[in-house]
A protein has these predicted regions:
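Glycine-rich phosphate/adenylate-binding loop and adjacent beta-alpha elements
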Residues: 1-46
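Short, intrinsically disordered, charge-balanced linker/junction segments flanking boundaries
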Residues: 3-6, 120, 213-217
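Mid-domain Rossmann-like dinucleotide-binding core that forms the NAD(H)/NADP(H) cofactor-binding site
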Residues: 51-131
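A general structural signal for well-ordered alpha-helical segments in protein cores
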Residues: 65, 139, 155, 203-207
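Glycine-rich cofactor phosphate-binding loops and adjacent beta1-alpha1 units
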Residues: 74-80, 101-106, 118-191
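C-terminal substrate-binding/catalytic core of Rossmann-like NAD(P)-dependent dehydrogenases/reductases
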Residues: 174-217
Length: 217
């Protein structure tokens, strides 16, 4: 687990280790895993049994998706008929896969721009090119997985089409400040949550998910 919370961090509370002040992330502003000798506490290691090594290599990435799913479950109201994953990249693919598993009674929708990548989301219930969605298109909650220069456009479209009192989990990273239509956010009573990186519980959830043959195949 690359995330290292401070020694005084108390596990099992309402606070997440990946946001606590004083923590750090190995290989991002701190010495990481390319050193000749890597020394880490035992609680920074999560064991797996049957996951193929080439799949286990993306455990940290999957754990980020698990964390986003957890945040959504905490803040989203009980009407979860239609959940959208906005984006067509690798993060969107992981989050959509997890959402399909974690929200079995929901219609999982993917909206993106890249036609070739969108074809890979064959497991999703609905897949749309963002340029083709109609004014009547709606959903209850959203995962934003775009990031970069496309973040502003993604936020604008999500705000336009989401139903009132929906939750938006922001997962895409932009290096630039992104303006938001606060008037419509307030008018619709939307809940916005930032989700970044992950902790031990998320790694354990990722391993549990990836141990299943139908997932890692």
């Amino acid at each position: 687990i690359p995330n290292q919370p401070p020694k005084e961090f108390e596990e099992g509370t309402e606070f997440y280790e990946n946001y606590v002040t004083g923590g750090y992330f190995r290989s991002s502003g701190h010495d990481g895993f390319m050193r000749e000798f890597v020394t880490i506490p035992k609680n920074r290691v999560v064991k797996y049994e049957t996951i193929p090594s080439k799949v286990a290599a993306i455990t940290e990435f999957v754990s980020v998706g698990i964390h986003g799913i957890t945040r959504m479950k905490q803040v989203a109201h009980s009407r979860r008929n239609r959940i959208v994953v906005w984006g067509s990249g690798s993060l969107a693919y992981v989050v959509a896969t997890l959402a399909k598993e974690k929200f079995p009674n929901s219609t999982i929708i993917v909206v993106g721009k890249n036609h070739d990548k969108l074809r890979l989301f064959s497991f999703a219930d609905e897949v749309y090119d963002v340029s083709e969605i109609e004014d009547g298109f709606t959903f209850d909650h959203a995962f934003e997985c775009v990031g970069g220069t496309g973040t502003q456009e993604a936020y604008r479209d999500i705000i336009k089409h989401i139903k009132p009192q929906g939750a938006v989990v922001m997962m895409g990273v932009s290096e630039f400040e992104v303006p938001l239509n606060t008037r419509d956010i307030l008018e619709k009573g939307l809940t916005w949550v930032g989700s970044s990186r992950s902790g031990r519980e998320d790694f354990e959830g990722a391993v549990q998910m990836m141990e299943r043959p139908q997932v890692h195949s």
